[in-house]
Amino acid sequence: MFKKLFRQDGNILNSELAEDLPIPRHVAIIMDGNGRWAKKRFLPRIAGHKEGMDVVKRVTRYANAIGIDVLTLYAFSTENWKRPTDEVDFLMKLPVEFFDSFVPELIEENVRVNVMGYRENLPEHTMRAVEKAIADTAHCTGLTLNFALNYGGRSEIITAAKEAMKELVSEGKTSEDLTEELLNDHLMSHGLGDPDLLIRTSGELRLSNFMLWQLAYSEFYFTETHWPDFSKEDFLQAIIEYQNRSRRFGGL
């Protein structure tokens, strides 16, 4: 089933993209609007999260189909613990259901799972599901499906700076020896590369403490569409918009 859909999506998506223009290597998405989607339909917020999980599967398929290397999804921030307990409990159960149902298909399509964030603070059942998904797909060499789970950009930078300084001190060096490259080596996203394109759904125009270091030169794409309604056409439009931009990285 997954292979059939994968091939269909690949044919449709690739036929719409400019062959002579690059696609983003790394796409990051702030998946926003689950609660508002549910409210519009007089449903509980968790219904929006449930629907959003299905969209994650579809968008993963789209990204894989067009040859994106890394797809990073902002799943749960360090600030999200402030939400109502019943909502947080549901969100912590979602990875278990998601990975149980989707990992076999990911393996079939050579997709590797990665999770960045403060995993040690996750509930035990969530941690087990995460670690199993990572282990089960460790041999895969295609798309990296990277989840930011219990993640905060500011905390990540502080943690990376502390680890970098420990390394320098152990080598008899000082803060004067700290470089961007060394700090980058200690970020949770090390080895994945910086996002080329950031997509945020639901019309909000902010980063919400997401990958603050890594997004320095990323292209941003904002859409009014709530995450549960985010379609193949929405994804394709974001990629086409990226293809039509000129990235200068501070130059001319």
From Swiss-Prot:
Annotated substrate binding sites: 33-37, 45, 49, 77-79, 81, 83, 200, 206-208
EC supergroup of this enzyme: transferase
Cofactor(s) recorded in Swiss-Prot or TrEMBL: Mg(2+)
Gene Ontology CC terms: cytosol
Family, as annotated: Belongs to the UPP synthase family.
Coiled coil regions in record: none
Keywords (A to Z) from UniProt: Magnesium, Metal-binding, Transferase
A Pfam family matched in the record: Prenyltransf
CDD domains: Cis_IPPS (cd00475)
Chain sites annotated for binding Mg(2+): 32, 219
Lineage start: Bacteria, Bacillati, Bacillota, Bacilli, Bacillales
The keyword Magnesium belongs to this UniProt entry's keyword annotation: yes
Annotated InterPro entries: UPP_synth-like (IPR001441), UPP_synth-like_CS (IPR018520), UPP_synth-like_sf (IPR036424)
NCBIfam families, per database record: PRK14830.1, uppS
EC number(s) given by UniProt: 2.5.1.-
Molecular function terms, GO-annotated: ditrans,polycis-undecaprenyl-diphosphate synthase [(2E,6E)-farnesyl-diphosphate specific] activity; magnesium ion binding; manganese ion binding
Name of the molecule in the record: Isoprenyl transferase
Record-annotated active site: 32, 80 (proton acceptor)
Organism: Listeria innocua serovar 6a (strain ATCC BAA-680 / CLIP 11262)
Subunit architecture: Homodimer.
HAMAP family, alphabetized: ISPT
Annotated function: Catalyzes the condensation of isopentenyl diphosphate (IPP) with allylic pyrophosphates generating different type of terpenoids.
